[in-house]
Amino acid sequence: MKIKVITSYKPGTWEQYAEKSVRSVLENWPEGIAVNVYYEGQEPDNHWHPRKKYIDLHNVQPNLVTFKERHKNDPVANGELQEIPGGVRRLPEAGGMDRGKGSFLWDSVRFANKVFCVTHAIKTSIEKDYDCVIWLDADTYTFRPIPRDFLENLCPNNSMLTYLGRENPQLNDGGKYPECGFVCYNLRHPEIQNFARNWEELYTSDSVFKLLEWHDSYVFWHLSKIYRTEKNVAVNDIGYWKGVKGHHVFVNSELGLYIDHLKGKRKKLGSSAKNDFRPQKNSETQNLTQLDYWKQIPPTLK
């Protein structure tokens, strides 16, 4: 299986965490896996590696630039509350606990970058005979070597997508949008190019603003549910559908055997915390917290 890993970082974050993340992939992922790093308007750093390639996102995705220019001065499209004449509006029923607040949940401009990184990789990587593209957030850290068969088993041939879902099949409550710090896109699936095109169209047509939330994980969830229900597309949910527990589903899943995800406050802490973990039901992760890396992390988030 020919695999490409992609990530992106915004200006000012290379030294903070992205460099550590990218270096950890190059050091601990199997030889032969290409790493594409998308950058957003800034000059790329000077870290060179034969398997790493920098891509100017704005240069290769002009439709992204058009979308961002169209909405850059609209506070609502950037997650804020102030409405302007002719601007976009949140749906009246949107928000839940965040209703009436500024929130990343509606920051369409910020999170469009990630979407267009992924769609560019899907559209262009198949031409170079790649089998799958794996998105990995730039605030992850691969703390030990990953076997190739582990990655290949995560991305089965019959599934279009592998992701960390947060829909609990036992509760049947509709669930929550996935954790998209890791997503595998199967380039050999007959619907994957349509998926990428439809994802971009939600932004180029401004249809994204018809959804309850506008960040990439929610939009991904919205579109993947359409493909699952209307096109009967198979997906590989390695999160709640596999019995994983906890809000920090990334480290509680089998990915936690090799990778940490420093979401939010964890960036300042330098790792996830012991109280992020929940009892493990799956045999492959029974001894997860006994790994040397997890033994050394702080007990709680501060």
Stretches found by the model and what they are:
Residues 18, 115, 139, 180, ...:
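Conserved glycosyltransferase catalytic-site signature
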Residues 182-301:
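Catalytic core and acceptor-binding pocket of nucleotide-sugar-dependent glycosyltransferases
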Residues 106, 110-164:
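GT-A fold catalytic core of metal-dependent nucleotide-sugar glycosyltransferases
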Residues 20-24, 119-120, 217-226:
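Short, hydrophobic/amphipathic alpha-helical patches that form generic packing surfaces
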Residues 103:
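Short acidic-hydrophobic catalytic motif
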Residues 143-208, 213:
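Conserved catalytic core of nucleotide-sugar-dependent glycosyltransferases
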Residues 12-16, 108-112, 211-214:
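Conserved phosphate-coordination/catalytic loops
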Residues 1-100, 123-129, 187, 262-269, ...:
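N-terminal anchoring/stem segment of glycosyltransferases
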